[in-house]
């Protein structure tokens, strides 16, 4: 509830961290609404998208998040992660590397070791997979629209399966489903 957030924000608030979606219930949180409130309070917002990205295509810019993270292995890729950070914030972060690596020497200042090239290359297959799914289903529009629509097809299938499960559970004697009455 956003009113609960408003009660927690104050002049000493510097950061708010949240999930984009519940890993347990799949509840989707309105990141943009939270970002607007957090920024109005003079704080920054970090969003964990690990439970959202496998089911919807994140739009980090539209979300208003200052930091957005998720794991590629959750979206058909290797065991690797991505962290999207607005540039000015990224430049202000202290480096993890040697002292002689400049603060603006990106991405090296945040790489305490060598990049795993195999994993990096493996992540390049994710857009190919989404493009193949879009082509298979004859989806049209811009590349982003096609990928969004492909992920939307995945989500629709998941929702149908989840609804089937919820309907089954609600019909079982001795089972009580607690939470929102939707998928």
What are these model-derived regions, one by one?
Residues 1-183:
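Pyridoxal 5′-phosphate
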């Amino acid at each position: 509830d956003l009113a609960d957030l408003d009660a927690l924000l104050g002049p000493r608030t510097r950061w708010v961290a949240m999930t984009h979606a519940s890993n347990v219930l799949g509840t989707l949180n309105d990141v943009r609404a939270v970002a607007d409130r957090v920024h109005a309070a003079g704080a920054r917002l970090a969003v964990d998208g690990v439970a959202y990205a496998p089911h919807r295509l994140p739009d980090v810019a539209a979300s208003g998040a200052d930091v957005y993270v998720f794991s590629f292995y959750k979206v058909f890729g290797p065991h690797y992660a991505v962290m999207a950070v607005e540039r000015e914030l990224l430049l202000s972060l202290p480096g993890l590397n040697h002292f002689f690596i400049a603060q603006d020497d990106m991405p090296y200042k945040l790489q305490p070791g060598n990049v795993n090239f195999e994993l990096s290359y493996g992540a390049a297959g994710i857009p190919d997979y989404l493009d193949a799914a879009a082509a298979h289903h004859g989806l049209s529009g811009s590349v982003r629209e096609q990928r969004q629509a492909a992920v939307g097809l995945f989500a629709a299938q998941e929702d149908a399966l989840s609804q089937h499960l919820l309907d089954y559970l609600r019909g079982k004697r001795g089972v009580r489903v607690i939470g929102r009455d939707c998928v």
